From Swiss-Prot:
Annotated GO MF terms: pyridoxal phosphate binding; transaminase activity
Source species: Aspergillus oryzae (strain ATCC 42149 / RIB 40)
Name of protein: Probable aminotransferase aclI
Family the entry assigns: Belongs to the class-I pyridoxal-phosphate-dependent aminotransferase family.
Cofactor requirement: pyridoxal 5'-phosphate
Top-level class of the enzyme under EC nomenclature: transferase
Function, as annotated: Probable aminotransferase; part of the gene cluster that mediates the biosynthesis of aspirochlorine (or antibiotic A30641), an unusual halogenated spiro compound with distinctive antifungal properties due to selective inhibition of protein biosynthesis, and which is also active against bacteria, viruses, and murine tumor cells. The non-ribosomal peptide synthetase (NRPS) aclP is responsible the formation of the diketopiperazine (DKP) core from the condensation of 2 phenylalanine residues.
Length: 420
């Protein structure tokens, strides 16, 4: 190991050795003279930034008090923030059982919440089923601290991942796994497809988890990033795991957990505010709170509390949906113009497009991604999302940018994709 002589633990050395090649490549890349790139690879929403800044500036100016300079005043985080989160979730996620403040633990972002959850759920080397394709960040998130293992679940046709055909694929992956399985992680809305799971599929997944005695983990960070899309007239609406009558379908509520943050739906990933919601598992709630109760910034808590309780919140969500739709149309009009295949989306700031339709190998895909980078646009190649072998050439494109930047990104992409 490259880090063997550095005095690190085996766990630390393993993490460093795994990530160091990527860090070296990134540092080398920064030394190259190049046109500043437009980032379409990171799933961030830039469409509400001015409104969020205006609102939170006022909140910090008027709402920051002397006690905010102390540690959070509640076991699971800032009391006002937790109260605001509970009211917000009850209003917009329509839970079957109302969410109480003592169901919630906060942490710096949903990824930290999930990391803490996995640390408390899994012994090192135990697995979590994750339907593919999935967010490439799960690869490091699972392993870096918790030493858990994402166990990929592939449906024969990737397009069927959000259908009832997922259930037999889950059964197969569970039975064939060489390591103990502790849970199923479902990202809903799905990343990178930007669509929602039907309620019936979610209920079947919860039943599957109940039958195996494992946990159902619902990552809902794009819950309110939905918009109208005529390409998907019959698309299922977003349904939170909280909305399902878990006991009513004969399952154990103590094994159902939900995660959300302000990062995606409110374009504020820099605030680092996330929460876990577990309604019938006091031990897990305490474990989650213990690990993160002093980690969230009071400034972020003040700003996020103001955002979640603002009288303007319904207006902001409506504005977000409108702007997402407009930004989506701008990107898809470009894709249609060049006959680039894409998967229609209606619940995310990104879409999945086949930017390298002639790709026969992963190297072919990588080459087109590199050409786009040279043209000044970063996109996220499909291989990183663990797509099926027959899906070479795809990439995730974030479209939720200001119009001027989106238009410039399209102009640059056209120099590459317009020649294929």
């Amino acid at each position: 190991m490259a880090s063997a002589g550095a005095g690190l633990s085996k766990r630390g050395a393993s993490n460093v050795d795994a990530i160091m090649p990527g860090i070296r490549a990134a540092l080398l890349e920064r030394t190259r003279p190049t046109v500043p790139r437009i980032d379409l690879s990171t799933a961030e929403n830039w469409l509400l930034r001015n409104e969020v800044i205006e609102l939170t500036k006022d909140a910090i100016r008027d709402g920051l008090k002397p006690h905010h300079l102390s540690y959070p005043n509640e076991f699971a985080g800032d009391a006002d923030l937790i109260k605001a989160l509970a009211a917000f979730v009850n209003e917009y996620f329509h839970p079957h059982i109302p969410v109480e403040p003592d169901h919630i633990a906060t942490a710096p972002g949903a990824a930290t919440c999930l990391n803490t959850f996995l640390y408390n759920l899994c012994e090192p080397g135990e697995g979590i089923l994750v339907p593919a394709p999935f967010w490439n960040g799960f690869d490091w998130l699972f392993t870096a601290r918790s030493s858990a293992v994402p166990v990929m679940v592939h449906v024969e046709r990737s397009a069927d991942t959000l259908t009832a055909k997922l259930i037999p694929a889950l059964e197969k992956a569970y039975e064939e796994s060489k390591i103990p399985i502790r849970g199923l992680l479902l990202t809903n809305p799905q990343n990178p497809y930007g669509q929602c799971y039907p309620r019936s599929v979610m209920e079947d997944c919860i039943r599957f988890c109940h039958s195996k005695g494992i946990h159902y983990i619902s990552d809902e960070v794009y819950a309110l990033s939905n918009f109208e899309n005529p390409e998907l007239p019959d698309a299922p609406p977003f349904v939170s795991a909280l909305q399902i009558d878990v006991k009513g379908i004969g399952c154990d509520l103590s094994r159902v957990h939900t995660f959300w943050s302000t990062s995606k739906d409110f374009g504020s990933s820099g605030f680092r505010v996330g929460c876990s919601i577990t309604q019938a598992n006091e031990a897990m709630h305490v474990a989650l709170a213990l690990a993160s109760n002093t980690e969230s910034s009071s400034l972020s808590a003040v700003a996020s509390t103001a955002l979640l309780t603002s009288p303007r919140l319904p207006e902001l969500l409506q504005l977000n949906a409108q702007r997402l739709q407009e930004a989506y149309c701008l990107m898809t009009n470009f894709l249609k113009k060049h006959q680039i295949e894409y998967i229609p989306a209606n619940s995310a700031p990104f879409l999945f497009a086949r930017v390298a339709p002639q790709a026969q190998t992963w190297e072919d895909e990588k080459a087109v991604i590199a050409q786009l980078k040279e043209a000044g646009v970063n996109v996220s190649g499909g291989k990183a999302y663990h797509v099926n072998e027959d899906q070479k050439g795809w990439a995730r494109l974030t479209f939720a940018l200001e119009t001027s930047r989106a238009e410039e990104a399209i102009k640059r992409m056209e120099t590459v994709l317009g020649k294929q």
